[in-house]
Amino acid sequence: APPGFTPF
């Protein structure tokens, strides 16, 4: 995942 990506 790219930096700053936060899955929920």
From Swiss-Prot:
GO biological process: defense response; vasodilation
Superkingdom of source: Eukaryota
GO molecular function, one term: toxin activity
Keywords tagged on the record: Amphibian defense peptide, G-protein coupled receptor impairing toxin, Secreted, Toxin, Vasoactive, Vasodilator
Localization (cell): Secreted
Entry GO terms, CC: extracellular region
Tissue expr: Expressed by the skin glands.
Keyword Secreted attached: yes
Residue stretches spanning the membrane: none
Family membership: Belongs to the bradykinin-related peptide family.
Function: Produces in vitro relaxation of rat arterial smooth muscle and constriction of intestinal smooth muscle. May target bradykinin receptors (BDKRB).
Name the UniProt record assigns to this protein: Des-Arg9-[Ala1,Thr6]-bradykinin
Organism: Physalaemus signifer
